[in-house]
Amino acid sequence: MLLEPIITSLLETDMYKFSMGQCIYHQFSDYKTTWSFKCRNTDVHFTHEMVEEIKEQIKAYCGLRFTEEELEYLHKIKWMKGSYVDFLRLWQPRYEDYEITEDAECGLTIETFGTWLNTSLYEIPTLAIVNEVYFRMAYDYDDLLASFEKKLDEKITLLKNSTYNLGLFSEFGLRRRLSAGAQELAVKKLNENKYPGSTFVGTSNVFLAKKYGITPVGTMAHEWIMCVGQGNHKHNPAYSNWYALDWWVKEYGILNGTALTDAITTDCFLRDFQLTYATLFSGVRHDSGDPFEWGEKMIRHSESLGIDPKTKTLLFSDSLDFERADKIASYFAGRVKIAFGIGTYISNDTDVPALNIVMKTTKCNGMDVAKISDTPGKGMCKNPEYVEYLQRCISWRMENDR
């Protein structure tokens, strides 16, 4: 291993991996999933040396275990149950679940195979490893870090002088961060400063949330809706949201209540997000499509159900920077609660372009699963026939299910 270990704690993942993980443990522990890595940058190539370093870093990650101090921290989270904490006490990543080759056009193929309970937890650390190895080995890292620090200080100044007023915002950048050190620096500086029109709430990185005594932020991801709704082959996949919301409420009741809307289009989501769920959930998250149109749609939906939109939160997390977040916050001011999850712009803004890398669920229980979001091209299913089938199911429901 050429570099120091990149992942040094099993807490170094996004919070929603634990909230989903607890549901998976209690309700879907026998589900099997396949996850596939993709680099969307067309001009990026991973060298043989990079791939070998990625393998060694993942092996080091697979040697980690939760400490009792970390487990105690998790157990104090109000929705975390002792049975899941006891499972995590025994849990360890398995390198045997990984298949890493150089077959892809970008020079790096990664797939993981195993229980959903295990493979779900691999996604975020794997992406963080790939990202940091690439930037440390492809560029002069010290120069990148210097440009990162300069841009970070400029961003903080823009918040302090009220050029941008975001209201509530959190850092969501673990998976595509420049490095562990860069992300920690960003979280530390954002947390220690005060802003007239913005409040830094926390981070999705549970390790950093614990270290700095701030809120670990996150509820559910697309994988939850895709696997719960499409992993049982007796289900009509156009009702994926209903199944996912139903099982979530069975686990958490009114806790952990931010629903993701765009796994199989927001319009289809709203067919299932009726009075019971719209009342129980504290808000919804935007991750694709036009944020202004989406926000208006959410407000109209709440009003149609007799719910005051001002009692609900719209969480925006799609490709945000401070300027875009400021415009959204200003547009919806006084009409609904607003919050932001901001990722790469905080954790990897340097003088070179960031990587656009993802790792997505591509199979569940031996069958294809897919996301059809509000932005074309964000899905990653390997079987176009399944995507066509899913789209037909959604279209039929939207046209016929009144």
Q: Where on the chain are the PLM-derived regions?
A:
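Ordered alpha/beta subdomains of enzyme catalytic regions
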Residues: 1-238, 358-402
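Glycine-rich phosphate/ribose-binding loops and adjacent secondary-structure elements
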Residues: 2-3, 212-402
